[in-house]
Amino acid sequence: MIPGGLSEAKPATPEIQEIVDKVKPQLEEKTNETYGKLEAVQYKTQVVAGTNYYIKVRAGDNKYMHLKVFKSLPGQNEDLVLTGYQVDKNKDDELTGF
């Protein structure tokens, strides 16, 4: 992987689902929407001064969105921060940097 580049897409893990669960309130505040279960489906990572996670989530039957979540380096402020999102995605949309 190229430093600063995106990794290959990988199936979501329990750790990625936990990240989605933790940033869900931030997403709801930013979109002014309330979501039921957000299911992590796939993700990519980008190593910066910490890690950006690009996560595809299913937010309903055929509703998908992409989340960008920043996790700082260990020992720094360890809060997860939702730094971007894209709504109106479908299951076949590729995760890209945004």
From Swiss-Prot:
Motif (Secondary area of contact): 46-50
Record-level GO cellular component terms: cornified envelope; cytoplasm; cytosol; extracellular space; nucleoplasm; peptidase inhibitor complex
Compartments where located: Cytoplasm
Tissue expression notes: Expressed in the skin throughout the epidermis.
Modified sites of kind N-acetylmethionine: M1
Reactive site (site feature) positions: G4
Top-level taxon in the UniProt lineage: Eukaryota
GO molecular function, one term: protease binding
UniProt name for this protein: Cystatin-A
Signal peptide segment: none
Alphabetic keyword roster: Acetylation, Cell adhesion, Cytoplasm, Ichthyosis, Protease inhibitor, Thiol protease inhibitor
Record disease entry: Peeling skin syndrome 4: A genodermatosis characterized by congenital exfoliative ichthyosis, sharing some features with ichthyosis bullosa of Siemens and annular epidermolytic ichthyosis. PSS4 presents shortly after birth as dry, scaly skin over most of the body with coarse peeling of non-erythematous skin on the palms and soles, which is exacerbated by excessive moisture and minor trauma.
Gene: CSTA
Family to which the UniProt record says this protein belongs: Belongs to the cystatin family.
Major localization class: cytoplasm
Entry annotated with the keyword rRNA-binding: no
Stated role: This is an intracellular thiol proteinase inhibitor. Has an important role in desmosome-mediated cell-cell adhesion in the lower levels of the epidermis.
GO BP annotation list: cell-cell adhesion; keratinocyte differentiation; negative regulation of proteolysis; peptide cross-linking
